[in-house]
A protein has these predicted regions:
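Active-site Gly/Thr loop motif
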Residues: 62-64, 107, 111-158
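Generic alpha-helical structural context detector
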Residues: 56, 88-91, 111, 115
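A beta-strand-loop signature enriched in Asp, Gly, Thr, and Trp
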Residues: 65-76, 96-119
Length: 159
């Protein structure tokens, strides 16, 4: 995908190999397509839009979003935040999308993204681009899976 002349055409041309929802296989193409939809719908790049509606309101501080050779942000794996920024994202989810008395994300959306959609492995589940723990909707994690993976985990039963 990263070396294709048109990453979006490359993604859309991939064959569907199983019944949707029957088997989980991670694919960075879905976040790439979502990033393109956000950019087209808002008229802003994914990094600029996220900065405006999420990062600045939360006071996340510096961020970096790596881009491919085509200039498109690597939506699946290219975001870099400081640890305190990651903690704030976890706190936002624990607070059902509210931050300092302001709604940053709708509470019903937070509930949907922390609800498992499909079992993956080792008692874990996945849904809406989020990895979750073995107990249904009792935990979520923001997981970095690169060489030095980072994970923020929150036990929602303690919220």
């Amino acid at each position: 995908m990263e070396v294709a002349s048109d990453r979006f055409r490359f993604i859309l041309d991939r064959p569907i190999v199983t019944e949707p929802g029957a088997k989980w296989t991670y694919c960075g193409g879905a976040p790439a397509l979502l990033a393109r939809l956000i950019a087209k719908g808002t008229g802003e790049t994914l990094p600029a839009y996220c900065r405006k509606v999420l990062f600045d309101p939360l006071g996340l501080g510096p961020s970096e979003w790596s881009v491919g050779a085509d200039g498109e942000p690597r939506a699946a794996s290219g975001l870099r935040l400081r640890p305190r920024g990651l903690v704030k994202l976890g706190q936002l989810v624990l607070a059902s999308g509210s931050w300092n008395g302001h709604s940053i994300a709708p509470a019903d959306w937070i509930k949907r993204v922390t609800t498992p959609v499909i079992a993956i492995s080792y008692g874990r589940s996945y849904g809406y681009h989020w990895h979750m723990g073995g107990r249904a909707a009792a935990a979520f994690s923001l997981a970095g899976r690169h060489r030095l993976g980072r994970t923020i985990s929150a036990d929602l039963s303690r919220a």
